[in-house]
Amino acid sequence: DCLLSRGLGDVYKRQGSPMALNLVKAGHSLTVFDLVPAAVKVLTDAGAKAAASASEAVKGADVVISMLPASKHVEGLYLGEDLLGKISSSALVIECSTIAPDSARKVAQAAEVRGIAMIDAPVSGGTGGAAAGTLTFIVGGQIAALERARPVLEKMGKNIFHAGPAGAGQVAKICNNMLLGILMAGTSEALALGVANGLDPKVLSDIIAKSSGRNLSLIHI
């Protein structure tokens, strides 16, 4: 297996590194690449191997997993740097970044042309879910590719959903994030209203947490 993450330097304390650590703990032979040495060291200390480049990391890999910051990084890596041309046609690519659906489709189509199975599988669950191996994977792509990925995803997550064809995982993730944003904004406004009218924010939070307004945004404040 191989994990590529130019975002590990940013997310290794959050999701990328815990996900990789769970794979190592499960007995997978993992080769990792990231631009930030400290991020790589966390994983090599746990038993993973370090690669000097993304191209080196994917050499001979059965499964390639990437976690990158944005669409431009995903397209730049797989298409701009032609990483797809260096991945075996028998390999499976699991792209876990949260990116634009069109970007996910574009890369997936390029992979299909080369005979490479690829799914977009953005995650939800935060740092705690990544560390505990209870993430939710929201998958777009062919069902056959998802079933190939399932044994790997199950080492990192608890809930695995097939949202539809390529890019559908990203659409579903956007919908989830939109609702989360609404809940966060609404929770903040409700607490601000209470404080403005003399309520203790802790008391108000406790009240809402045991009432119909309870939501994850409130619980994690």
Question: Which role does the model predict for each range below?
Answer:
Residues 1-8, 12, 219-220:
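Single conserved hydrophobic/aromatic residue that forms the stacking wall/gate
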Residues 54-66, 71-114:
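Rossmann-fold NAD(P) dinucleotide-binding segment
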Residues 79, 98-181:
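Rossmann-fold dinucleotide-binding core
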Residues 167-219:
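Helical "substrate-binding/catalytic lid" subdomain
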